UniProtKB/Swiss-Prot annotation:
Designated gene of the protein: LHB
Outcome following mutation: residue 122 to S: May be implicated in female infertility
Residues with attached carbohydrate: 50
Name of the protein in question: Lutropin subunit beta
Keywords on record: Disease variant, Disulfide bond, Glycoprotein, Hormone, Hypogonadotropic hypogonadism, Secreted, Signal
N-terminal signal peptide: 1-20
Expression (tissue specificity): Pituitary gland.
Family: Belongs to the glycoprotein hormones subunit beta family.
Subunit organization: Heterodimer of a common alpha chain and a unique beta chain which confers biological specificity to thyrotropin, lutropin, follitropin and gonadotropin.
Organism: Homo sapiens (Human)
Location in the cell: Secreted
High-level lineage: Eukaryota, Metazoa, Chordata, Craniata, Vertebrata
PROSITE patterns in alphabetical order: GLYCO_HORMONE_BETA_1 (PS00261), GLYCO_HORMONE_BETA_2 (PS00689)
């Protein structure tokens, strides 16, 4: 009987590994398509561009005794490989550089947020809002 219970336990544990290795219920950190609003101080227009950004879930941990121990560093979904593309904003006055660059995520990873290259804040209320009138279409360089 003990042998049968041991085999059953082994079978259940091996199947659990197969279940855990399948696609997660929530998408892990990966590049996704997104629309960004692009504008520049001194130029009277705003343009929306299609790009890829990093989004998804990263494993995090929290201490049970938060008051006693320091917090654990948390990771975020951030760029691994990125390239920058540029567009030219129309209607910029003389003396204002009309070229604006934006990131295109090539690959992503879970890691610490680098404030030097990323916005580490939470979700924005209105990510596509512009201070200037919005134009459709792109003027890539």
């Amino acid at each position: 009987m003990e042998m049968l219970q041991g085999l059953l336990l082994l079978l259940l544990l091996s199947m659990g590994g197969a279940w855990a290795s399948r696609e997660p219920l929530r998408p892990w950190c990966h590049p996704i398509n997104a629309i960004l609003a692009v504008e520049k101080e001194g130029c009277p227009v705003c343009i929306t561009v299609n790009t890829t950004i990093c989004a998804g879930y990263c494993p995090t941990m929290m201490r049970v005794l938060q008051a006693v121990l320091p917090p654990l560093p948390q990771v975020v979904c951030t760029y691994r490989d990125v390239r920058f593309e540029s567009i030219r904003l129309p209607g910029c006055p003389r003396g204002v550089d009309p070229v604006v660059s934006f990131p295109v995520a090539l690959s992503c990873r879970c890691g610490p947020c680098r404030r030097s290259t990323s916005d580490c804040g939470g979700p924005k209320d209105h990510p596509l809002t512009c201070d200037h009138p919005q134009l459709s279409g792109l003027l890539f360089l």
